[in-house]
């Protein structure tokens, strides 16, 4: 995890910290692991995400 050192304004430091947290996906990972997810639910979520990526790629190429 990156260390943020900003001298001066607290708001700037907080904004930079939030940006780093969002970029590394720490908050989303925490929310996802907050409760137990059954393997079948996890598999369906991953399949849904893969399908979404495929459709997005096809739309980008103009095939859909």
UniProtKB/Swiss-Prot annotation:
Reply yes or no: does the keyword Ribonucleoprotein apply: yes
Q: Which GO terms describe its cellular component?
A: ribonucleoprotein complex; ribosome
The alphabetized UniProt keywords are: Ribonucleoprotein, Ribosomal protein
Please name the GO terms that the record assigns under molecular function: structural constituent of ribosome
Coiled-coil stretches, from where to where? none
The UniProt entry's GO biological process terms, in alphabetical order, are: translation
Ribosomal protein as UniProt keyword: yes
Q: Which InterPro entries match?
A: Ribosomal_bS21, Ribosomal_bS21_sf
NCBIfam families registered for this protein in UniProt: S21p
Its family remark reads:
Belongs to the bacterial ribosomal protein bS21 family.
Which named protein is this? Small ribosomal subunit protein bS21
> What organism, scientifically named, is this protein from?
Sulfurihydrogenibium sp. (strain YO3AOP1)
State the encoding gene: rpsU
């Amino acid at each position: 995890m990156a260390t943020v050192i900003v001298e001066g304004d607290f708001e700037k430091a907080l904004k930079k910290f939030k940006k780093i947290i969002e970029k590394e996906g720490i908050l989303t990972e925490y929310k996802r692991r907050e409760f137990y997810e059954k393997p079948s639910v996890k598999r369906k979520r991953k399949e849904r995400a893969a399908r979404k990526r495929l459709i997005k790629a096809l739309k980008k190429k103009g095939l859909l």
